[in-house]
């Protein structure tokens, strides 16, 4: 319903526009369900223009958008919550990217990459661009979708391995032996979060917001379904230690399969150290595997 309106009353602006659904909100990942309908739910679209075009044409475009039908396929138009404003409708490209990555341009240095939260990179590259007549929005998007430079990815993998081994293979078991169940559950949560993160890295995909990370595993080709099943089974198991060990073995096998390490140790921290010291970058080679 938006495109026909542009073709009718905003035909001169149409060549400057990109249309899509990208950014915050579970609908951008395709994860909306009945529970999602209690806030920020309804038919919506993002319309992106360059900053100068946005300032020049925003009044005309917003006036045209006001005249669109208030329902679509039986659904009411988007009702924004207090925290859901400025996600949809008319947006300018510079501000959209700056909101998530702190710049209107893709990162060019290791330091710039490290400053951007990974969940922000996931958010700014999710969803779909339906039409990009000018190509400006997609040009930046594609550079971000090309993923981290390999040295950064390997450093992040090494850090995940250090944390997985610390939380799951070491501290979880020690906390259980001390009968400190609160601390043990803290360890288990941290273990699960780092395991999920590692699977995203092995798939060269940015890790998404924690609430949807488990669901997103099902969309990842490398170990996604297997790790999802092991984590689900572990949650319901009385004795979780065998699952911790199995998960670590599966991850170690995949790391060796991807030729990231040839270390045969069962302790993932050893693999993390090995990967870090073999990164083909002088800065990262001497960087702590505990840091990313």
Model feature map: region roles:
Residues 6-52:
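Active-site nucleotide-donor binding segment shared across nucleotidyl transfer reactions
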Residues 7, 25, 49-50, 69, ...:
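Alpha-helix initiation/capping motif
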Residues 49-54, 178-182:
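A generic structural motif
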Residues 55-176:
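Conserved NTP/Mg2+-binding pocket subregion across the NTase superfamily
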Residues 119-285, 291:
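Conserved nucleotidyltransferase catalytic core and NTase-mimicking acidic/glycine-rich helix/loop elements
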């Amino acid at each position: 319903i938006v495109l026909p309106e542009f073709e009718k009353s905003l035909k001169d602006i149409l060549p400057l526009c990109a249309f899509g659904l990208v950014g915050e909100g579970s609908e951008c990942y395709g994860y909306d369900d009945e529970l999602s309908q209690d806030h920020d739910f309804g038919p919506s679209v993002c319309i992106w223009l360059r900053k100068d075009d946005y300032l020049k044409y925003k009044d005309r475009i917003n006036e045209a958008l006001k005249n669109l039908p208030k329902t679509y396929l039986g659904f009411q138009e988007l009702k924004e919550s207090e925290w859901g404003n400025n996600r949809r409708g008319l947006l300018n490209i510079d501000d959209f990217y700056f909101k998530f990555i702190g710049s209107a341009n893709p990162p060019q240095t290791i330091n710039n990459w490290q400053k951007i939260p990974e969940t922000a990179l996931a958010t700014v590259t999710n969803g779909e661009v339906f039409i990009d007549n000018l190509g400006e929005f997609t040009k930046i998007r594609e550079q971000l979708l090309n993923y981290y430079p390999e040295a950064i990815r390997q450093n992040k993998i090494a850090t995940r391995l250090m944390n997985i081994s610390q939380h799951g293979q070491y501290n979880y078991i020690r906390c259980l032996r001390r009968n400190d169940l609160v601390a043990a559950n803290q360890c288990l949560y941290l273990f699960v979060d780092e395991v999920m993160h590692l699977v995203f890295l092995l798939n060269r995909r940015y890790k998404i917001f924690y609430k949807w990370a488990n669901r997103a595993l099902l969309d990842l080709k490398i170990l996604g379904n297997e790790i999802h099943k092991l984590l689900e089974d572990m949650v319901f198991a009385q004795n979780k230690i065998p699952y911790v060990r199995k998960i670590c073995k599966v991850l170690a096998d995949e790391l060796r399969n991807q030729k990231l390490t040839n270390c045969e140790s069962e302790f993932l921290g050893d693999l993390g150290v090995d990967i870090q010291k073999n990164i083909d970058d002088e800065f990262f080679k001497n960087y702590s595997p505990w840091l990313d």
